């Protein structure tokens, strides 16, 4: 049997292609209630449903921002929320030409027999949840696997376990009409250099695509959300041009050209770093059969949060900041970013060790 072609095949291919539209990006707004709770205290905002809804409305209704977005990844709570005037967020997105997506994993747990490595939960009942999310308006999904670099990590067991989990998630999504975004995140934590990150990234991505093929996943109806290949957080920094060369080479060696788009995660880079690295990749003159874009959460929202401060009178200012970040990253997908979007706050490091959504 080759790739699975069920009743949603044509829709999956069309939506995966749309997600990868050059000049458009994905906003990751799928932070769990707990993760939002870690960010709100920095701006003295209480972590309650009304404030979470207000932040999401600020983002989703920013004038002029939706044309820069192809999709928004939502937390389950947000999928069913509405704007202040009663319009479902899902409808507001669709009216603006943006595909709603949904985080479907249930977080990570320690993988027995390893040195603190993890596997991702959420396969139980996933088919039923995907069917419900499709009915609610979602058209793509996200599942995050997490690997770390250490003296002997990631272990072959952790790589295999997480690759198979991503593949099982992928085929279940496709059977229920959702484009699976495959996210094998290799954490930036550590003292390793960029060569070590590239080597690990190649092994992880090769294992993922072996598993996706073994599970008959239709690659044309998927998207990849990998880490950018960088030195570890405690290692010496390198230029965006070096990062671009290593990252694109890693993709060339591992990612089939049937995959329409690669939507990088920011992995705790500052907003400006993440944008400059993406821009350098798109300026690189080499074989790139996939659209190179991003699915950023922290790297699109941090400056916006600081401008908002949870206050109604700051919404317009915060939306201006969000629009500037969205526009800047859109330009970076075309290799046309000039730098400076978001002001001084955009250069602040967003790294959180052992980051959990």
Swiss-Prot record:
The keyword Lyase applies. One of its GO terms (molecular function) is fructose-bisphosphate aldolase activity. It comes from Spinacia oleracea. This is Fructose-bisphosphate aldolase, cytoplasmic isozyme. One of its GO terms (biological process) is fructose 1,6-bisphosphate metabolic process. InterPro entries: Aldolase_I_AS, Aldolase_TIM, FBA_I. Pathway: Carbohydrate degradation; glycolysis; D-glyceraldehyde 3-phosphate and glycerone phosphate from D-glucose: step 4/4. The active site is at 183 (proton acceptor), 225 (schiff-base intermediate with dihydroxyacetone-p). SUPFAM superfamilies: Aldolase.
